[in-house]
Amino acid sequence: MRSMLAISAIVAAVFAVPASATVIDLSTLNRAGSAQLVDGALQLTHTSKVSNASGVSGAGWLTQGVSTTSSFSTSFSFSLKGDDSGKMADGIALAFQNVGTNVTGVGGGDVGYWNIGGSGSSAVGSVIRSWTHNEYGLSTNGKVQGLDAAPFNLGASNNVTGSQTVSYNAVTHELSMSGIFTDLSTGLSYNVSDTATVDLSAKFGSTMYVGFTGGTAGTDADQRITSFSLTSAVPEPETYAMLLAGLGMIGFTARRRQAQK
């Protein structure tokens, strides 16, 4: 009985380990396309004041893969700012993919999210689109169409900030997003949320790359990621090792006591 209580105590201790959040230095992201580091932020696109009908896209990726078999959560903040000469465009995305870290997708309204590295519908993530689209939400197939209507006209605002937290449950395969958008032209803030089901392990294998994309075309915007963190919701490998060692010691002690009776 005492052995079982000890085992229960060890297991409880393992799963009481708090999640470990890692704040990502944006300068360490691998940048592709139009992306650059500006004032400590990841600037995905900028206001060039030059029309580019074929589209421009930029991206920034963690250089190390993230496990798809463990639950996790990632949070980021962003700013989208036009040059006040019309509706800003076109938007950004938090993206998961397994193509590589020197890639981006189609620019313009596809916000660098569709066809990442020529891989078509491979991406999963959270998309925000401005200009006349004005929508947001989770996408599990690389597409940016058919999302939820934004709570205000992002494109016409020309000045939007916000934050999102996107979490993945590796057991239920539920992807969830919650966040807030602030219209700096009015000072009003709005809550946003979405959920989707996707098996990241089946889609990407054991690891994937996490990062951001952004795109512009005929109309542009200064689109930046201003903060980024990743939280592991599972115990570290060392904790599992401690669990196994503890269970082994308890088993050995129990067997020894039985042999002495």
Which role fits each region the language model picked out?
Residues M1-M4, E236, R255-K261:
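Positively charged n-region of N-terminal signal peptides that target proteins for export
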Residues V17-A21:
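Sec/Tat signal peptide C-region and signal peptidase I cleavage site
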Residues A9, T165, T239:
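Ser/Thr-centric signal marking residues that sit
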Residues E236-R255:
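A short, hydrophobic C-terminal helix/tail in secreted or cell-surface proteins
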Residues S8-V14:
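Bacterial N-terminal signal peptides
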Residues T22-S232:
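Polar, low-complexity loop segments and adjacent catalytic/binding residues used for recognizing
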Residues V11, G60, V234-E236, I250:
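Hydrophobic aliphatic residue packing
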